[in-house]
Amino acid sequence: MQRRHILHTAAALALIAMGQPVLAQNTFPNKPIKLVIAFPAGGPTDITMRSLADNAGKILGQPVIVENKPGAGGTLPAQQLQSAQADGYTVAQIPLGVFRIGYTTKINWDPVKDISYVINVTGYAFGIVVPADGPLKTWADFVAYAKANPGKLTYGSTGTLTSPHLTTELVAQKAGIQLQHVPYKGSADLMLAVVSGQLMAAADSTGFAPQVEAGKLRVLNTWGEKRLDKFPNAPTLKELGYDIVQNSPFGIGAPKGTPPDVVRRLHDAFKKAMEEPSYVASLARYDMLPNYLSSADYTKFAQDTVGREKVLIDKLGLAKPN
């Protein structure tokens, strides 16, 4: 009788233990979620992602707390996922730089296989700006100065190997000019540098909009398929003769092995958060638009993008030595 009681008790405990992951998933989340983003506070990424996080927190019933982790070309949040618990309580912004890091830096994780892709949310509107009172009034002026002064035209971006950096270098290669790149950690510091004259130009997302609207900066070009509504006089790269469109889509990832039910819960909450007018309005401030991809489509995007980024890295001669 005692032996039967022990067996029944052991079986019951085993069933309880087996049920714990399911219970955890069904009650997710029961504490705050951390969203790590790749750029500093006060810039367009920070402002728009905080709006998204605020909306998602209300939907999930738990706060989504933003943590800024700038540097390393926007790849630090993805690296943080490699040591985070796969429970959905740490998620991260995945900028395009994540898909090129393996070609330029020795890493011990795979950008496709070692991240659970939750949802793509938006992309950037980029351009090149110069001081409004400076000598460079048009893109033709920019190219002419750079050709006459090889390596002396300074421009900044939000970091080495970011999309603004690499796209500008690709344009420079096509234009036959040599520029001097100065990396910054975020848009706020970058804009201060170009407005104050420390730099001759900046390649950035439209975090430059307030400075342009204040008459301090001039937009020489933008990088979308069509001209931006805020800056209709600025030509696209395609109009200037470069077959380049860059909007650098980004979304949210979780650690590898995050339970599918948790990924689905996060996806559904962030998708609803994307549809809130407050988030759409925060994007519009920077000429950005919602750009939804489901978890499956975002995973496929990651796989395809890793291949495309290799072509760009090779073209610019930036691949790490074997």
Regions found by a protein language model. Name each.
Residues 80-89, 102-189, 237, 247-282:
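Hinge/capping helix and adjacent helix->loop/strand transition within the periplasmic-binding protein
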Residues 3-8:
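N-terminal export leaders
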